[in-house]
Amino acid sequence: MRKIILLLFVMPLFLISCDKTIKSEKGAIDIISNVYFNASKGLTDHKQFYISKINYVNDDIIELVPNIQAPEFIDSVYYIKDTLFYQPKAFEEAKSIIFKEEQVTGSPKSIYKKRFGAVWVNIPIFDYEKRKDIADTVLYNNKSYKRFEINTPDNYSVYYVHPTDTIIPYSLNPIADKAYKGRLERIDSYDKKKDLFSTIWLIHRQQMDKEAVDIFQFNRDLAEKVSKTASK
């Protein structure tokens, strides 16, 4: 009887440990899109868009939004904390952004209302209920992906979810992430009427952008100065 009770106690713990996730403390996320025009005639007529460079340290996020025409230049910088974003700033102004000051004096808005750079969503993918699971695949760097497709009269899309227990502070669609126990990292979509093929990539990396590193370092240095002054 004791063995049965012990087994009943251990099993839930085992199931919980299997579902345990790991929160990434530091890193960067690139959101990149490729658009192919007149896709049925080939994939030579295309353009790449660098949508966003998301850099994070714990719950503090610095999003660099590149210029559409010249992605090596930064158009605007967002400070994001948890589920709130603050007024975007020009890059030169953002170099001296003070996180604590933004949190106290800023006018934050829900990240789900953000419309430039990376877009946060908390709703299902359009026509998600029509999805059909298809064969798993392996792409670049030997990464495995679970896949599902959505086929409608106007569009055909394939979604790629990489199985992982590591949580990062941005998701192309958290509902799909949860359902397929991973991270949605790629979406291929073909607009049948416009003959337009597009793909969007989420690329997670450990190394942060120097521009963001400098902003985080500025805030760390400032916090140390305040702490030393307070201790005197």
Regions found by a protein language model. Give the residues of each.
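Extended soluble regions of mature proteins
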Residues: 24-232
